């Protein structure tokens, strides 16, 4: 094998290692059976959420996972494999892919990684049911606001009762 081909392969592996290291979550999927239109739509939805979808040879993925120090992903790198990398939102790739797989039965989630730890299929599916980061923050905010709101209503009720003339 020529030196240039080996260098190109090493560069691809290094690029994938960098994506592994920068990602907060990764979802590995089997896209066999999807039409071009379906893959294009999936890529579009992922891109809108800031998630990159890559189709890389399984050999390169195995080498990159080993080089990045992620053991346990090798079993997911079989057959036609696509990988979704998210650098910001942990929930986004799992949620988008799980929702998309409801309409495209051929799409199959194989596994992934969540914040540096290898995740099983069940963990990825559980993650997909969670609200997004913004949704979780709004829930937290409403929980924090509830006691303050109740105190404000109580103070207003007391003030209103003092304003009413005695009967």
Swiss-Prot record:
InterPro entries the record matches: Ribosomal_uL10, Ribosomal_uL10-like_sf, Ribosomal_uL10_bac, Ribosomal_uL10_bac_type, Ribosomal_uL10_CS_bac
Molecular-function annotations in GO: large ribosomal subunit rRNA binding; structural constituent of ribosome
Domain of life: Bacteria
Pfam family, one: Ribosomal_L10
Alphabetized NCBIfam families for the sequence: PRK00099.1-1 (NF000955)
Alphabetical GO biological process terms: translation
Keywords, alphabetical: Ribonucleoprotein, Ribosomal protein, RNA-binding, rRNA-binding
Function noted in UniProt: Forms part of the ribosomal stalk, playing a central role in the interaction of the ribosome with GTP-bound translation factors.
A GO-annotated cellular component: large ribosomal subunit
Gene coding for it: rplJ
Family: Belongs to the universal ribosomal protein uL10 family.
SUPFAM superfamilies xrefs: Ribosomal protein L10-like (SSF160369)
Name of the featured protein: Large ribosomal subunit protein uL10
Quaternary structure, from the entry: Part of the ribosomal stalk of the 50S ribosomal subunit. The N-terminus interacts with L11 and the large rRNA to form the base of the stalk. The C-terminus forms an elongated spine to which L12 dimers bind in a sequential fashion forming a multimeric L10(L12)X complex.
